[in-house]
Amino acid sequence: MKKSVFVLFFLCLALSCDASVWPAVWIGCHAEKSGADLRVAYFRKSAQLNTVPDAHLIRVSADNRYKLFVNGVLVSLGPARSDLSNWNYETVDIAPYLRQGKNTLAAVVWNYGEKRPMAQMGTNEIALLVCADGAAPVFNTDWNWQVLTGESYSSLDDFVVPGYYAADRGERFDANNYPWGWQTEQE
């Protein structure tokens, strides 16, 4: 009896979850580096808004980590740690950052590759998903987003620890190769 109640509870829980089909697609890019290396991509989409909504919720996720910007302002980091069967996303209200006229949504996405920290699950591909709730899907990820791969970040390959090590190897940042202004189209 306990076993059937337990199974019934989790069946009801699973059926109550948001299993709807999202009107956005995962987008990615081809990176020159191999799947073993840290790879970074910069995604961006601009759109004109005639009016600024009171609320504009979006759901956003990436493989592995992202920073999301609206009109150059950092608004979200994520996602929470996931596994390949249960991928997490963040829900963000971007309305306070929108303005009448041209708006730009941008994200930098890191994929740590095969040498990622033990807790960082992923597919070894750079990918981004943005899905807007409601009637304003202008920022949903689709093939109209611009993407740029970057060489400003690299792994610290010379970082060697004897024995078992489950954390990230660390990153090296080269500001000379960073695409300054990409968050707001100020290249």
Predicted regions and their residues:
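Aromatic-lined ligand-binding clefts that engage carbohydrates, nucleic acids, or primary amines
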Residues: 47-50, 54-69, 105-107
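Short beta-strands within extracellular/lumenal beta-sheet-rich domains
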Residues: 37-49, 88-94
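A short, structured loop/turn motif at beta-sheet edges
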Residues: 52-54, 95-104, 131-139
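Sec/Tat signal peptide C-region and signal peptidase I cleavage site
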Residues: 15-19
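Beta-strand-rich ligand-recognition modules
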Residues: 67-122
